[in-house]
Curated annotation (Swiss-Prot):
Residues binding Zn(2+): 16, 18, 196, 277
Identification of the protein by name: Adenine deaminase
Cofactor note: Binds 1 zinc ion per subunit.
Residues at the active site: 199
Site features described as Important for catalytic activity, chain residue numbers: 220
Length: 332
């Protein structure tokens, strides 16, 4: 079996994907028309042209503009269902999706509308596509601690539907320490915790996520390599890094995929996984990310399998289910 066949055959878990970042131009245009919302683009082609950006902030500007068309429960359902269909094509059998309630509640869309649409899509994905899923609620780090506390309060009645809380949006200037008290409260309430750190931000942010937020996983974390002591800790603690190669390329975290450090991290014993982040904006879903790193870094079949195994080991599914998928990978 060659590498491209193996990539298609491997079952995978996706642990770092923003549901708002799966918004394809065609669906954005369709929902904007359905909801009679003016967007600054007259066609799908114009939206596609706008998906041309060079850093995290210019991407976020477009990302939030797109999210403005999401108003009704059906909109959130359609968004998630379109992503699940992509998962089915890529043999992503389990996904843990981020959603950003503050992006919607500050526009007057209720927390309940967002969650109900996503929940319904999750249920249908399990029933019709055999894909399991968890929801992870993210706090926007460019907003205040007070705003994050309010969002956490809104989530408390839905603890059964939200497995973890996370931290995303503009990283630089918004260290994890800003939200230490919010994350302490979230942990007390029984949520697992993850956080974006070490993408554009320095290794110090990864230390803070570990020590102050007490995370179960680090999202991105590729800049950890700059700090040997941090690397040692990540390896010792088997701390997962949910790495997003095409995202790193598109946002100029790396200038060339051949420079990406995912293979080095993997071979040094860091628990790295492959993910798509915001696939509609970054030009690729799960398998596209695997294909890109395989082509650039010449990954072996064993390395590809290890990345797939890592995705299940780092997931929040139960141990028996993890072992079943890992066994299947080992038999391929």
């Amino acid at each position: 079996m060659n590498q491209s066949e193996l990539i298609r055959a491997l079952p995978k878990a996706e642990l770092h994907v923003h549901i708002e970042g799966t918004f394809e131009p065609e669906l954005m245009f369709e929902i904007a028309q359905r909801n009679h919302i003016d967007i600054p683009y007259k066609s799908v082609e114009e939206i596609k042209k706008a998906y041309n950006f060079h850093n995290l902030q210019s991407f976020l500007d477009i990302y939030y503009a797109g999210a403005n068309v999401l108003i009704n429960e059906q909109d959130f359902y359609d968004l998630a269902w379109a992503y699940f269909k992509k998962c089915a094509e890529d043999r992503v059998v389990h996904t843990e999706m981020f959603f950003d309630p503050q992006t919607h509640t500050e526009r007057g869309v209720s927390f309940e509308i967002v969650l109900n649409g996503l929940k319904r899509a999750c249920k249908d994905a399990k029933e019709h596509l055999g894909i399991s899923s968890h929801l992870i609620m993210c706090f926007l780090r460019h907003l205040s601690e007070e705003d994050a506390f309010k969002t956490l309060e809104q989530a408390l009645p839905y603890k059964a539907d939200i497995i973890a809380v996370g931290l995303d949006s503009s990283e630089v200037g918004h260290p994890p320490s800003k939200f230490a008290r919010v994350f302490e409260k979230a942990r007390e309430e029984g949520f697992l915790v993850v956080a974006h750190a070490g993408e554009e931000g320095p290794p110090e942010y990864v230390w803070e996520a570990l020590d102050l937020l007490k995370v179960n996983r680090i999202d991105h974390g590729v800049r950890s390599e700059e700090d040997p002591a941090l690397m040692q800790r990540l390896i010792q603690e088997k701390m997962p890094l949910t790495v997003c190669p095409l995202s790193n390329l598109k946002l100029c975290v790396v200038n060339d995929m051949k420079e990406h450090n995912i293979r080095r991290l993997l071979n040094q014993g860091v628990h790295v996984t492959v993910n798509s982040d915001d696939p509609s904006y970054f030009g690729g879903y799960m398998n596209d990310n695997f294909v890109a790193i395989q082509a650039a870094l010449d990954l072996s079949n064993e390395e590809l399998k290890k990345l797939a195994i890592n995705s299940f080991e780092a997931s929040f599914i139960d141990e028996e289910e993890k072992q079943n998928w890992i066994e299947e990978i080992n038999q391929i």
